[in-house]
Amino acid sequence: MKGLPVLLWLCTAVCSSYPLHGSEEDAGMEVLQKYLENYYGLEKDVKQFTKKKDSSPVVKKIQEMQKFLGLKMTGKLDSNTMELMHKPRCGVPDVGGFSTFPGSPKWRKNHISYRIVNYTLDLPRESVDSAIERALKVWEEVTPLTFSRISEGEADIMISFAVEEHGDFIPFDGPGMVLAHAYAPGPGTNGDAHFDDDERWTDDVTGTNLFLVAAHELGHSLGLFHSANAEALMYPVYKSSTDLARFHLSQDDVDGIQSLYGPPTESPDVLVVPTKSNSLDPETLPMCSSALSFDAVSTLRGEVLFFKDRHFWRKSLRTPEPGFYLISSFWPSLPSNMDAAYEVTNRDTVFILKGNQIWAIRGHEELAGYPKSIHTLGLPETVQKIDAAISLKDQKKTYFFVEDKFWRFDEKKQSMDPEFPRKIAENFPGIGTKVDAVFEAFGFLYFFSGSSQLEFDPNAGKVTHILKSNSWFNC
């Protein structure tokens, strides 16, 4: 039997704490051996161990593994250790620098290209594109880094799906266990990320969530090693999240990536905060009030703006708490008590609606030629007010909600789609007939009605969570 001396010595050192029998014992020892070889640097041709258990190389490696993964350091193959070893994880080893690869490799530039070479069949292409884009955004939010996607040629980060042996001499192992692996920054295959296509990739909490795994692997592509902090994204063992909408990096992740690239710097693409005198005390409008509702909600360059009366909260992944400002401190001509707001990302423009008029802004700039009549969009004259609006980047469509109906606008053709309006209840079951605001995050749509918020999965076509409107404020 290949590796028999290793397995015999492993059993001598660690069997006593994990009662196994026959083939089960052999299987457990083989799992341990491979785990220590793959992730903790155990030599594959170990022929001699000292007879004293607490000084054997195997016991020391078990203790090293237990310490890193946050387990009790028994030096034995106990049930907690065995359970954790069977959980899905990243294929990158755990030994090395605490938060970065040895030598701290990093990209020597702040703008990095990526390319999605091929796609899994588990998800629509647009869902894969969105998951990768959001995963990179997680790191972009806390660094000076920016990312752009190319469709052909060699990118800094090449992203692909593969099974078993796939050309890098580190084969995948089929469903479960190793989910993906990635390489540190550098030329050639360095920086690339590979995903095991034998997994069942999803964009929700069933199966293996592509966004969460991609965010972890792309951390490696940027130079981060595994973290021993179980709360960190860079912890090696996969942890499913039931609240993808409020996902944020741990401080450990932020400290690690900023040790390589520094904190984010303000640029023309970032909304600059006004002077302190224009920033308000949130107690002016209690953001954690159970009765809080919003006039409109929109994204703006990766942030989320929550509008209420003359004010708005600005929520960014960079800060745990939202800022609170007067609308006029950013955009003096915009109306208060607006009806709806939405961002068209490929135009870098946010549109504000009140009554039968529409305004347009780009960062701090209020665009010339506005306000215009909402009827220039093709809405009928009978519509004098929009309740809520959202533009979906993948579809290049904008949805306008009016009472219990909605219209759909084609951003590419710049015209209303035929066969609209349609009933909200038929296309968004469970949402109800009153929509105050809506925006998209992490592949879900968030509909606001009064002080309530509904998380809607557009792929499943159903409501997945009922939340308070201010759940984004850590209340």
From Swiss-Prot:
Glycans are attached at residue 118. One of its GO terms (molecular function) is protein-containing complex binding. A motif (Cysteine switch) lies at residues 88-95. Changing residue 92 to I/A: Induces partial autoproteolytic activation. Ca(2+) 3 binds at residues 173-174, 176, 178, 196, 199. Its main location: secreted. Residues 18-97 form a propeptide. GO terms for cellular component: cell body; cytosol; dendrite; extracellular matrix; extracellular space; mitochondrion; protein-containing complex. This is Stromelysin-1.
